[in-house]
């Protein structure tokens, strides 16, 4: 497996709609000229943005967190340009970008250093071959203070690894439970 360059990412996005919407360069300023957390194509990856759709975890129901029987009432839905995550808590969001992963490619997501250096960790499982959808992002606030996430700015970097052999069974072939997801998607079993 080898990591793919900006040239490959641009070609796959433009010719095969791998990423929509797609930004071929790095965007570092908003329309008013103010600095933002960058997004778009980098040398060996693609920096994604989160949408304005957030689900912030709350313990108001004092329930046990169980991935097999997750209570959707454990979240407060927020639509905003900014999301405040309570101390030692987490929020879910989704990417602005919709992904269509090629059959010979695996995508690994890493958090951006701007957030990591503030104690905000982004977690996403790998995007498997032939998976498609909006990526659900999990932000953990590891600090004892509230933390801010900005919508429509960079939050994580996707790294694309192309195998030297096409997989026998893709995510699509298996009928993966998160195939084609749109919006913030809660745990499924």
Curated annotation (Swiss-Prot):
<keyword id="KW-0378">Hydrolase</keyword>
<dbReference type="GO" id="GO:0015949">
    <property type="term" value="P:nucleobase-containing small molecule interconversion"/>
</dbReference>
<protein>
    <recommendedName>
        <fullName>dCTP deaminase</fullName>
        <ecNumber>3.5.4.13</ecNumber>
    </recommendedName>
</protein>
<feature type="binding site">
    <location>
        <begin position="112"/>
        <end position="117"/>
    </location>
    <ligand>
        <name>dCTP</name>
    </ligand>
</feature>
<comment type="pathway">
    <text>Pyrimidine metabolism; dUMP biosynthesis; dUMP from dCTP (dUTP route): step 1/2.</text>
</comment>
<feature type="binding site">
    <location>
        <position position="181"/>
    </location>
    <ligand>
        <name>dCTP</name>
    </ligand>
</feature>
<dbReference type="Pfam" id="PF22769">
    <property type="entry name" value="DCD"/>
</dbReference>
<keyword id="KW-0546">Nucleotide metabolism</keyword>
<feature type="binding site">
    <location>
        <position position="171"/>
    </location>
    <ligand>
        <name>dCTP</name>
    </ligand>
</feature>
<comment type="subunit">
    <text>Homotrimer.</text>
</comment>
<comment type="similarity">
    <text>Belongs to the dCTP deaminase family.</text>
</comment>
<keyword id="KW-0547">Nucleotide-binding</keyword>
<feature type="binding site">
    <location>
        <position position="157"/>
    </location>
    <ligand>
        <name>dCTP</name>
    </ligand>
</feature>
<feature type="binding site">
    <location>
        <begin position="136"/>
        <end position="138"/>
    </location>
    <ligand>
        <name>dCTP</name>
    </ligand>
</feature>
<dbReference type="GO" id="GO:0000166">
    <property type="term" value="F:nucleotide binding"/>
</dbReference>
<dbReference type="InterPro" id="IPR011962">
    <property type="entry name" value="dCTP_deaminase"/>
</dbReference>
<dbReference type="InterPro" id="IPR036157">
    <property type="entry name" value="dUTPase-like_sf"/>
</dbReference>
<comment type="function">
    <text>Catalyzes the deamination of dCTP to dUTP.</text>
</comment>
<dbReference type="GO" id="GO:0006229">
    <property type="term" value="P:dUTP biosynthetic process"/>
</dbReference>
<dbReference type="GO" id="GO:0008829">
    <property type="term" value="F:dCTP deaminase activity"/>
</dbReference>
<feature type="active site" description="Proton donor/acceptor">
    <location>
        <position position="138"/>
    </location>
</feature>
<dbReference type="GO" id="GO:0006226">
    <property type="term" value="P:dUMP biosynthetic process"/>
</dbReference>
<dbReference type="InterPro" id="IPR033704">
    <property type="entry name" value="dUTPase_trimeric"/>
</dbReference>
